[in-house]
């Protein structure tokens, strides 16, 4: 393989120019993130009274919608619907750089559309902050980054574990495992940072509301967590040829 061919393979030019399904994949990422953000932030709207949102309700809404979408779109694009997941999969060479970049753009546009729909469909006195994620005022931005990196690490690590194509021991539902990791992250960290775990999820409402406070935290934290999860899984835990398929209990 020539140096030029090697660079093209790493970047993934053929994934864009020769893959007939690339547009289906990008539309799937757009729609998946659209539904994630619209359904997810819909659960945070401040209706008040008996319909006031609770932490448990929000946590399970985000977890269940991701599990559902993974079943619906997983066979088309892998249903990343999260730049941190996409970047984590870049680290393990499961997706090329160029294809990953196109995925991330589709995810961000879908997130904006999802947030815009909820704003348009919700009474103005209920919208509140439109689910814009924010750091507890008692925390520093650095602490917010650490929390977001932590909970996103768990999410992306689970994605790698259940999507490892050399494993043959997975007996449960991979989408459910991913969804529950998101629910767990929310239950743990909503009070800290709003538990974004997903730059696109924070980006969409921020664009629609024009609220950029600490937005960088919701990019740096999840991306760092995704990169670390991808690197750790690839270095220490990815099933390789000749390895035992699973731990023998």
UniProtKB/Swiss-Prot annotation:
Protein's membrane topology: Multi-pass membrane protein
PROSITE patterns per the UniProt record, alphabetical: MIP
UniProt keyword Ion transport present: no
Q: Which residues lie on this side of the membrane: Cytoplasmic?
A: 1-26, 79-100, 160-169, 233-249
Q: Name one Pfam family in it.
A: MIP
Q: Where in the cell is it found?
A: Membrane
Residues in compartment: Extracellular: 48-57, 122-138, 191-211
CC per GO annotation: plasma membrane
Keywords annotated in UniProt: Membrane, Repeat, Transmembrane, Transmembrane helix, Transport
Q: In which tissues is it expressed?
A: Localized in tracheolar cells associated with the Malpighian tubules.
Q: What is its main location?
A: membrane
InterPro entries per UniProt: Aquaporin-like (IPR023271), Aquaporin_transptr (IPR034294), MIP (IPR000425), MIP_CS (IPR022357)
Q: Which domain of life is it from?
A: Eukaryota
Instruction: Write out the transmembrane intervals.
Output: 27-47, 58-78, 101-121, 139-159, 170-190, 212-232
Q: Where is this motif: NPA 1?
A: 82-84
Span(s) of short sequence motif NPA 2: 198-200
Molecular function (GO) terms for this protein are: channel activity
Q: Which CDD domains match?
A: MIP
Q: What is the UniProt domain comment for this protein?
A: Aquaporins contain two tandem repeats each containing three membrane-spanning domains and a pore-forming loop with the signature motif Asn-Pro-Ala (NPA).
Q: Which PANTHER family match?
A: AQUAPORIN (PTHR19139:SF291), AQUAPORIN TRANSPORTER (PTHR19139)
Q: Which NCBIfam families match?
A: MIP (TIGR00861)
Instruction: Give the record's subunit note.
Output: Homotetramer.
Q: Which family does it belong to?
A: Belongs to the MIP/aquaporin (TC 1.A.8) family.
The task this protein performs is described as: Forms a water-specific channel.
State the protein's name.
Aquaporin AQPAe.a
């Amino acid at each position: 393989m020539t140096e030029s061919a090697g660079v093209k393979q790493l970047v993934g030019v053929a994934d864009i120019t020769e893959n007939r399904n690339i547009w289906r994949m990008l539309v799937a990422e757009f729609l998946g993130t659209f539904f994630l953000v619209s359904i997810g932030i819909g659960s945070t709207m401040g209706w008040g009274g008996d319909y006031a949102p609770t932490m448990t309700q929000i946590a399970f809404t985000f977890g269940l919608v991701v599990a559902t979408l993974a079943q619906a779109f997983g066979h088309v694009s892998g249903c990343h619907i999260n730049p941190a997941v996409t970047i984590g999969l870049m680290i393990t060479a499961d997706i090329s750089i160029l294809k990953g970049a196109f995925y991330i753009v589709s995810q961000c546009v879908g997130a904006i559309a999802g947030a815009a729909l909820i704003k348009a469909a919700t009474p103005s006195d209920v919208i509140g902050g439109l689910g814009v994620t924010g750091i507890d005022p008692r925390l520093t931005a650095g602490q917010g980054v650490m929390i977001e990196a932590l909970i996103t690490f768990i999410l992306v690590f689970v994605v790698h574990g259940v999507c490892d194509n050399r494993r043959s021991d997975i007996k449960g539902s991979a989408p459910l495992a991913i969804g529950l990791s998101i629910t767990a992250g929310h239950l743990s960290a909503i009070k800290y940072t709003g538990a974004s775990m997903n730059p696109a999820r924070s980006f969409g409402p921020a664009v629609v509301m024009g609220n950029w406070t600490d937005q960088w935290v919701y990019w740096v934290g999840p991306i760092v967590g995704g990169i670390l999860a991808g690197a750790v899984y690839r270095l220490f835990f990815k099933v390789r040829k000749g390895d035992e398929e699973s731990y023998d209990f």
